[in-house]
């Protein structure tokens, strides 16, 4: 198209055009607007320092008229940057995110894990990996991987399977449709995930005459599709026919901001509500229909009701194997499913009656159609009894009095008592998500932030930064095990650098508690799951000296205040001090590697060696054969 067809043009580099365009992108839902891209995380190298780096500098010190600021933060690791962006997006219910940029080769590849974490969790992040020269004159450039079978393949093709949208810009004019489609995916509640646009380093710096309309304010209206009338009628028929219905609330309930409608629906119908990791807090824990977590790491109340349910109503859940207990949780031979989900892919799971719609819109419609419906009083009494019995077990776990080291459940109990309803607790990996899902009492949708789709070790440290950027008014508490800490601790330096006040609770047990317990139960004797200094044996033994990192000293070296405690009472006092401080603080406490953990009533399928010379493995395989017998497809 000729220049004359536009109202005018402006000459900018590709990188400058990206920043100016992104500074004027907004989302809108329910009449509320937000800046879609709230800021930029970036680590610069030769692949982006003179492109995106220059554009961010120019935005900061010499922005053009109509160009909004693009706040920039320098992280320490590219994976951590993407985790922070994803945590920010999760906290804003996917209305906002951050962009990330890295240099070519290893810097860009470091973002692949973060992209997978975001996409698995259905969270929008915008990633700009740098790429080799489009001209191919400097070839191979530093950090370029050569593929002799195809010269257009680069390491950034690794982003394709973990991104919801992928593109590579080899000419400036390709940027316009690429960015517009990227924004479409970021703001589509059914399609969202990682959007990756690879930028050759020479193209980033190439100038082009851009139509000025490209940089005008653009508002992306986040849709709330209602359910088809026929789908609601079919769902209503199944609910009316059920004797023991159970709702499973997933993360989509929270992202839809449908908690009020879920509470109203449960109160009107008496149908109990269990929650997934992503859905915890969708209904307040003190609601008479709230029965807590369900699945492999759920509590007895939710799981006992799930065992006998004849109808499961999934609201915004993707039915991970932890939710279904590897397809053994729903034991009623006549169980069927109604799935409310904005994504047809998830709505179709478990051969369900599909209600493809926004969760809030569908719940409103169901509440209206079921105005005269309520579960039987005997079922209501059973729900109350299950709630009461599990509440007593939660109290036992929170106050177990373990010695000589406290159990991690006691730390969680103290936090649950001390944190406010609008504060945020963060976790992702190890034994802690299981204990938290079973025990944590969440009263609001914002309080519980556990990434358990990709369950990425290392998420917790950078995630705290992203959450605090999204909710500066809240106390943000990230619970970190010593295993996950050693995967990705360096964003502590970024937190200190930016003066971001968060609280880290570091539980040090000198090993991998979760995988150690799993290893033992599967016949592998906790092999390779404890930190030990190698002795004279052929493999690490319990009798070998504990080899632990001095994490307290390490955290101080990053610029974080550290409070070291030994008892739960000391922990409570330390938390109060950390909350009163205006600096980032770590509370360090040693906990018992061997538990105890909450009682579990559900299974998880981890395949066991079919043949082995080890008796422990042979016994575990026999148990495995029995445990998997209830598995089935729900048809």
Language-model segments: what does each one mean?
Residues 136-150, 347-348, 355-356, 363-364, ...:
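Thiamine diphosphate
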Residues 40-52, 387-462, 467:
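Active-site diphosphate/adenylate-binding microenvironment
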Residues 249-251, 315, 429, 480-483:
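Glycine-rich beta-strand-to-loop/alpha-helix junction loops that act as flexible
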Residues 2, 6, 173, 211, ...:
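Phosphate/pyrophosphate-binding active-site segments
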Residues 2-374, 414, 418-421, 501-504, ...:
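N-terminal alpha/beta PP-like core and its mobile active-site loop of ThDP/TPP-dependent enzymes
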Residues 163-166, 394, 398, 562:
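Short amphipathic alpha-helical interaction patches enriched in hydrophobic/aromatic residues
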Residues 14, 154, 257, 407-410, ...:
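A generic structural signal for residues located within well-ordered alpha-helices
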Residues 158-159, 209-215, 387-393, 552-555:
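Short, basic/glycine-rich phosphate-binding loops at helix/coil junctions
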